[in-house]
């Protein structure tokens, strides 16, 4: 309404709620379940501050003090992840720690980042057997909050990157606009149900059209041919 950036489905649950109400409509009270969101790994509880604090600060809902705390946490998380990426560990250095977890021993040296991708391996445990990690965390003053966030980012990196890739593909569809006065009934290649739903809801973009119940992937391909890939 005011020309600002939209709150979209992969950024917050309120984005899911608004998009559902606009594209799907309701015939009963709407309940916001996590199952309604297709990007649940991106919309985790633990990263809510990382996702939403910048936007909250931008529109004046976040105090300077809280924003400064957020920036400090973000910096600590990035520092710890970067440290894990560049530091290598020898098999002998963490042999006893892995044995205590009943985890497969290393056969050769590995980056700390790779070791942390194992289920039971934690920064908290590793710093007890790696003096240089403990020293770094003390020097930089890594908080428990930052340590937890860094660990989650490392362990779930593959899943997070896959969801981001899917979300970015769908974002491209959001950039393909449909004229407000377009006559969907003029397109015989669309199914009758799709023509009816599209004419009623009148989505502004192909991305929104793709989320309307009754509009199939084949219908979306027809729209892509018409309005450009």
PLM feature segments, named:
Residues 1-8:
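Short, small-residue-biased leader/transition segments that mark boundaries at the very start
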Residues 10-43, 54:
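A structural-propensity feature for long, helix-poor, extended segments
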Residues 36, 42, 48, 53-58, ...:
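Extended, charge-enriched "interface" segments that sit outside catalytic cores
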């Amino acid at each position: 309404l005011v020309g600002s950036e939209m709150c979209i489905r992969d950024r917050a649950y309120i984005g899911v709620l608004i998009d559902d109400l606009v594209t799907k409509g309701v015939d009963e009270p709407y309940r916001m379940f996590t199952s309604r969101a297709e990007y649940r790994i991106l919309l985790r509880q633990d990263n809510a501050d990382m996702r939403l604090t910048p936007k909250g600060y931008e529109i004046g809902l976040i105090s300077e003090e809280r924003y400064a705390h957020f920036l400090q946490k973000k910096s600590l998380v990035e520092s710890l992840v970067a440290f894990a990426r560049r530091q290598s560990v020898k098999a002998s250095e963490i042999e006893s720690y892995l044995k205590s977890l009943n985890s497969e021993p290393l056969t050769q040296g590995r980056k700390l980042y790779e070791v942390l991708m194992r289920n039971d391996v934690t920064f908290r445990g590793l710093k007890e057997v790696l003096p240089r990690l403990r020293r770094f965390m003390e020097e930089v003053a890594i908080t428990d909050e930052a340590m937890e966030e860094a660990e989650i980012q490392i362990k779930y990196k593959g899943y997070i990157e896959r969801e981001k890739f899917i979300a970015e593909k769908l974002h491209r569809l959001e950039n393909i606009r449909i004229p407000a006065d377009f006559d969907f009934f003029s397109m015989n290649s669309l199914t009758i149900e799709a023509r009816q739903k599209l004419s009623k809801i009148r989505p502004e973009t192909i991305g929104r059209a793709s989320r309307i119940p009754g509009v199939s992937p084949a219908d979306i391909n027809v729209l892509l041919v018409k309005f450009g890939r």
